Amino acid sequence: MKVRASVKPRCEYCKVIKRKGVIRVICSRTPKHKQRQG
């Protein structure tokens, strides 16, 4: 999980979602692409 100021989908499998007011990127294919805005 990377914590970044700016989160972007890194591949076609990345999804941008909002949980409890925090923007996150989850990826079904490459778990390394997981990100959270912070």
UniProtKB/Swiss-Prot annotation:
GO CC terms of this entry: cytoplasm; ribonucleoprotein complex; ribosome
The keyword Transport appears for this protein: no
Name of the protein in question: Large ribosomal subunit protein bL36
InterPro entries found in the cross-reference section: Ribosomal_bL36, Ribosomal_bL36_sp
One GO-annotated biological process of the protein: translation
Taxonomic lineage of the native organism: Bacteria, Bacillati, Chloroflexota, Chloroflexia, Chloroflexales
GO MF annotations in UniProt: structural constituent of ribosome
Family: Belongs to the bacterial ribosomal protein bL36 family.
Keywords for the protein's UniProt record, in alphabetical order: Ribonucleoprotein, Ribosomal protein
